[in-house]
Amino acid sequence: MLKKKRFLFVFLAAASLFTLCACGAPSSQNSEPDLTSETPSSEEPSSTSETSAPESWLDALSSEPFAIFDFSEGKDMYGDKSINIIGDSISQGLNSDLFYDYSWAALFKEAIAKKYGTHNIGYVSLLDRTNEAVPGREIHTISFPQGEWERYYVSGNTPGGMSYATHQQGSALRIEVNRQEGGKDRHINGFYVYYPEGPYRSTITVQVNGQELAVINANRAEENGCARSEYIALPENCPDDMQIDLIAGDCTDKSVIVSGISYIENPNELIVNNYSLSGIQLVNIADDALQKMCRANVVILTLGTNDAGMGADIGLFNSKLDRVKYACQENGSLLIIGNMIWDRADDPDYASVYKNALRNAADEAGGYYLDFNFARIRSDKFLEASRPWDVHPTVIGHDLIAQVLCEYLENQE
């Protein structure tokens, strides 16, 4: 059973404001509305008159690593070699139908697999589905076969921005995933569980198809919203259809919170984590979580659409960008900021203060800035014409974003 819960700083918009937001409607489990430098930064990526099919441009992509990426050592908060994507619903994949195949982030992972030989799916949000208004879903489904769970949405203090919590011993959160989803090998040999730890947290028993594989002790003296389990390998002969049950331990004066899962082929290889969440704003994210997500070899930040649409305080917006900038500089992370605030023909100055802030942050961090309006102008099918309020790219739009990003990276030295 699922109870609904929100933090106070999540704002609900009227329908007129919804047109400005990169957000999707919530999963069916929760019916309330959600809102969602060497810098060649001004250089327009090369454009083509025709839209290439995904297999076309991916096939044409060189297998040579991107020259500006350095994976000689792991730099993320867990010691992994990683690329962390931090965005909203556009980057989570809304309107791409199958997030894990057709979103720009999924296509970018295909490019990374070609160049680096790694097929790790990485972090996947527990916000698994949207409604029919803006279609799409994650690779797994979430259910609650036992006990009561509360959803903390856009909570901001965990990687990925949302979590489920229970105060009942024996409560179970179930994650169902098929290792051959859609008839394609998903390269899932194991996984990590994300959870907050602290003095008021309990244990989490991890079962796969009824077999206990691990017990996570989240009870620690100090709070850490970004804890992650040890790698949990699947047993031999594990069936393709998997039920991962996360079962709460003793909750006397304690709770269990689960904030995500990461599907892994090889834990020693590069991981692309997509920490994007429908409805989130940059100003929603707690400083500690933001700084920790910026600990990676490469950080791709695509936030700003919801901040602009909801009129987020520009001072706070710039303060959060400063956190991103300083965290990347301190950690030696390469920062790429992608602008996904779409231009408006009837309002050329729309959201210019936010766009300028994004560009300036990339410049000041010695990173890269890429305006994805350059992808939008390649096709009149980039957005859904039948939904003029919808800022989420179509499958064609997602493909163009990934294509423009990879072309851009190929041309950097």
Task: Tell me the role of every PLM-derived stretch.
Residues 1-11:
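Bacterial N-terminal signal peptides that target proteins for export
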Residues 19-22:
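C-terminal motif of bacterial Sec signal peptides marking the signal peptidase cleavage site
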Residues 27-79:
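N-terminal, intrinsically disordered, polar/charged segments of Gram-positive cell-envelope systems
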Residues 64-73, 282-292, 315-324, 353-356:
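Alpha-helical scaffolding within the catalytic cores
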Residues 309, 342-413:
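Catalytic His-Asp segment of secreted/periplasmic serine-dependent ester chemistry enzymes
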